[in-house]
């Protein structure tokens, strides 16, 4: 028993979040800072392709403006079950209206209702050791315990993170963006960022209080048991099961909305993408090395060699920036039997993007925890792509949203009815009507 206890990992092993360092940032164990934004998303079903392409170009420009080798962006699309108790208790003035409302309510509530939550995380990595001042050299040899509360955030780093967040809030206003902060409820303080991180982990909504100790211990409260092909998330009310997918090879082209099928999926899932900016010199080196490898191997893909040359020229002309990209899809179900059907459907939906999909097995545990900001070391099969590719893959699309309570109700007023969006499968030809871009580097 004691040997098993010694092998048990601490809750903060993979949740490296110490505390709230400021209204805009969480402090991580390694000194990095994390800010999180929540987005309503942009409506896409009836949007004109010109508008879709314009918004894609604007996202690419935004990425170029905030590019820094210390910045990592991470997007989460969380599809989970909606609360069926949020149907507005509206009073009807006639018997016919009451009968119509009762019938409509019964029909809506007989279905499984889903909702999509979109999050954008901004991670400002700690200053490299080469950039430490002489007075801080001694800190390299000081042994720190994980989650040392004595660690403080640099005012300069906090200011830099706040500047990036301000830029994102301004440029993404069309997506209904707001910053996650602390909220007060019944005299208690809760962390919206910790709640979002827990939602990414488990696919379930739950309040996370502000604690005096390590914040990671408040986020990781369900027991995660990793098997050979699936993960069991054992909570107080029962267990749920998860399986993960990743990209083995990137698609030849990317276009805005290439993963929109998942927004209407009949299962719970979390789509995670991370993009760590690369310096121009490092990006040019990756392209040159890839091109030299193809020439040395006498690769017959002449079009790809030409595309690399063109991409290197566009990179030098500041048409885009490059970054280290990773994508994973984690699906959830209430039982292993249901998980098999969900996994088959999820793999098919993800493959509609044109990528080669692989189910995680040996790297399943790493794939599960790599979805959290700050765990980039756990990513498997990352690939270098351009900001234009990432702006297309992370399109920030969503169905129109309302709210029975909270921030959106305060802005838009009291809701009248609950409406359900039906998911429609868009033909491949229609889905690619928007502008597409070749991937300058394809994962092999």
Model-derived features: where do they sit?
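Extended, folded cores of ATP/NTP-driven motor/assembly subunits in large transport
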Residues: 1-395
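Glycine-rich phosphate-binding loop of nucleotide-binding enzymes
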Residues: 42, 49-52, 57-64, 396-444
